[in-house]
């Protein structure tokens, strides 16, 4: 059996790691980088992922997709998606099932299908490093992801050809990376994870007892729609508004200009982590009747901080809530771990330090810790990492809708998983023959204000006065945080159960179709790569043969020369087409036609050696040499 790899599937960047001996190792991608931009571009003949996709984003804005994690498992009508529609250069559309999908070149693509392209890149990166096929992975998700978002992430893994052995929360993974092998007893850490699109805060207790380490999540919270992308968007809005004031042109209507501004805003934000000011300079950003327009705006660190201070403040509010849920005070936190690229911002570091009254650790790489932790969990599942126990929690309360539109909670938020809980309910009317079990996730008392995870019916209840039948409802949450719900009539023994697959999720048939499409695309990609190699080989042989014709000169007779040149012309014509077999055949034909050229070259070389040899012999005196030994 092969290795279980750890993948941090990020909003902005993704990272892959694997256990190498007793340590987790981050794997460099084909471009030599340790992280890969979570960007996918669809061109006329191929799908680009990572840096190659990012490089062409400006010229292909409508078909270059980024921050897809913000859409995964979300309904089209949701407030977060409607907010994104206004600022994304690509088209977000409503799927038949009500999900937020993306329209690319007339095709509707599901977020798990798009995210699978990034996972395939991570899989290939690991396979190139390990020299063997990889089929199993641990994939991380924000701790505050709901059931639909977790299911969608597992679906993305399946489409990419990966058996997702475990979904692990990002802050928990970071804690594993930080605490593995530590000999300290009973330390409580806070993991503040502000990534590209999501924010999590988890309070985790790491306990060492008799050689075994236990990582227990005490409480978790956050916001699955707050991250570096939102910080970028504040800068983008500022730049666009300033340009509109100066030039009277709104760049939001120009996708190509918007993409250029997005890149510049992200770059400016990063630069302002180390500089006090930076200039955003974009010549020829647009044009109108008066001619081309140039954008030049100075952005200071103070201005950036003013633009985003409410976002940072909202993350600090979450800190207060989670500490309270964990039953801990600020003074009981031993260490603070910062995870996610956005935590490099000085304002974020300052506000977190002010809240806890101490500086965060500087020895944890915010871009790599999550993938490393996922690889460690892969090692635990594989049996390569011993004496480590991970106890995670469910981030949101789970329950069912009961009479009066109330949510009755069966499993409280921050309950350690896996877990199972049952409760007995009854009918609301006399002689009721069926009940509908409506499964909910959230913290509101009003059922309609929570996230609906799905519903099912239990039928065949014997007629009886209201309140008499006993219906036992059981919630079962596995280690991935995925939920199974069953309802059983204790009188008749009839039972109905469902694995919660959100009504907005992909069906098994859709996933299988996407898996088949991915496999077909992989075959098409392989054929395209082989065609390119054949073209390159043909070009190289044609060029080398031409050079040899020149060098052979008169040693090559005219008929042979004409045949070789005709073969070169045939090969170059074939190389412009898409038929690899034709290119290979014409390559072989040129090699065969070039045989007289080899003979001519050899004859010319031999003819050149003869006079040189005799010239060398003229006036050469044979000498005898005596070996002198140095005895010093």
From Swiss-Prot:
Residue numbers bearing the Phosphothreonine modification? 198
PROSITE patterns xref list = HSP70_1, HSP70_2, HSP70_3
Q: Does the keyword Nucleotide-binding apply?
A: yes
> Keywords of this protein's UniProt record, alphabetized?
ATP-binding, Chaperone, Nucleotide-binding, Phosphoprotein, Stress response
**Pfam families, per this entry?**
HSP70 (PF00012)
Is Phosphoprotein there in the keyword field?
Answer: yes
* Chain residue ranges for the region called Disordered: 601-632
Bias (Low complexity) occurs at 601-613
GO MF terms, alphabetically ordered: ATP binding; ATP-dependent protein folding chaperone; unfolded protein binding
**Under what conditions is it induced?**
By stress conditions e.g. heat shock.
Superkingdom is Bacteria
Homology family: Belongs to the heat shock protein 70 family.
NCBIfam families, alphabetized: PRK00290.1, prok_dnaK
Described purpose of this protein according to its UniProt entry: Acts as a chaperone.
Q: What is this protein called?
A: Chaperone protein DnaK
What is the organism field in this record?
Actinobacillus pleuropneumoniae serotype 7 (strain AP76)
Upper classification of the organism: Bacteria, Pseudomonadati, Pseudomonadota, Gammaproteobacteria, Pasteurellales
């Amino acid at each position: 059996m092969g290795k279980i790899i750890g993948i941090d599937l990020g909003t902005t960047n993704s990272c892959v790691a694997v256990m190498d001996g007793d340590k987790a190792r981050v794997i460099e991608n084909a471009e030599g980088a340790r992280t890969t931009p979570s960007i996918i571009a669809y061109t006329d003949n191929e799908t680009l992922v990572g840096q190659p996709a990012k490089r062409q984003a400006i010229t292909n804005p409508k078909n270059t997709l980024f921050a897809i994690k913000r859409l995964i498992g979300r309904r089209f009508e949701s407030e977060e998606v409607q907010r994104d529609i206004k600022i994304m250069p690509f088209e977000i559309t409503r799927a038949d099932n009500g999900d937020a999908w993306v329209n690319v070149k007339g095709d509707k693509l599901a977020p798990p299908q798009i995210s699978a392209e990034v996972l395939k890149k991570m899989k290939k990166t690991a396979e190139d490093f390990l020299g063997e096929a990889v089929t199993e992975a641990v994939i991380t998700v924000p701790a505050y992801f709901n059931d639909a978002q977790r299911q969608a992430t597992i679906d993305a893994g399946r489409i990419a050809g990966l058996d997702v052995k475990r979904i692990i929360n990002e802050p928990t993974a970071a804690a594993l990376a930080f605490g593995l092998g530590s000999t300290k007893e009973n330390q409580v850490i806070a993991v503040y994870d502000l990534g590209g699109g999501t924010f999590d805060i988890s309070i985790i207790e790491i306990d060492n007892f008799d050689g075994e380490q236990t990582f227990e999540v005490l409480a978790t919270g956050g916001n699955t729609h707050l991250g570096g992308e939102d910080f970028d968007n504040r800068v983008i809005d500022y730049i666009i508004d300033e340009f509109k004031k100066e030039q009277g042109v709104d760049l939001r209507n120009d996708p190509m200009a918007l993409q250029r501004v997005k890149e510049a805003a992200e770059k400016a934000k990063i630069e302002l982590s180390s500089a006090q000011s930076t200039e955003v300079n974009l010549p020829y950003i647009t044009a109108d009747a008066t001619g081309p327009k140039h954008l030049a705006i100075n952005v200071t660190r103070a201005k950036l901080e003013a633009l985003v201070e409410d976002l940072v403040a909202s993350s600090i509010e979450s800190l207060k809530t989670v500490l309270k849920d964990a039953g801990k005070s600020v003074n009981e936190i031993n260490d603070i771990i910062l995870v996610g690229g956005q935590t490099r911002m000085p304002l974020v570091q300052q506000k977190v330090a002010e809240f806890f009254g101490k500086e965060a650790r500087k020895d944890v790489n915010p871009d790599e810790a999550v993938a490393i932790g996922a690889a460690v969990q892969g090692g635990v599942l594989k049996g390569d990492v011993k004496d480590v126990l991970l106890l995670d929690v469910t981030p949101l309360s789970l329950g069912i809708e009961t009479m009066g539109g109330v949510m009755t909670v069966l499993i409280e938020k921050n309950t350690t998983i896996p877990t199972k809980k049952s409760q007995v309910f009854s009918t609301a009317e006399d002689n009721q023959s069926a009940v509908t079990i409506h499964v909910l996730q959230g913290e509101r008392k009003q059922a309609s204000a929570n996230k609906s995870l799905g519903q099912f019916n239990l039928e065949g209840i014997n007629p009886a006065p209201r309140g008499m039948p006993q219906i036992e409802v059981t919630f079962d949450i596995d280690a991935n945080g995925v939920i199974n719900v069953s309802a059983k009539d204790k009188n008749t023994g009839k039972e109905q159960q469902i694995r919660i697959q959100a009504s907005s999720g992909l069906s098994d048939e859709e996933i299988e179709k996407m898996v088949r499409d991915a496999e077909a695309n992989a075959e098409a990609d392989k054929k395209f790569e082989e065609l390119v190699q054949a073209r390159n080989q043909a070009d190289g042989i044609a060029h080398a043969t031409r050079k040899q014709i020149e060098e052979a000169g008169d040693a090559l007779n005219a008929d042979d020369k004409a045949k070789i040149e005709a073969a070169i012309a045939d090969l170059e014509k074939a190389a412009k087409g898409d038929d690899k077999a034709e290119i290979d055949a014409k390559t072989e034909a040129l090699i065969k036609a070039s045989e007289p050229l080899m003979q001519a070259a050899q004859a010319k070389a031999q003819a050149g050696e003869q006079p040189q040899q005799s010239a060398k012999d003229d006036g050469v005196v044979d000498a005898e040499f005596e070996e002198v030994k140095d005895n010093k």
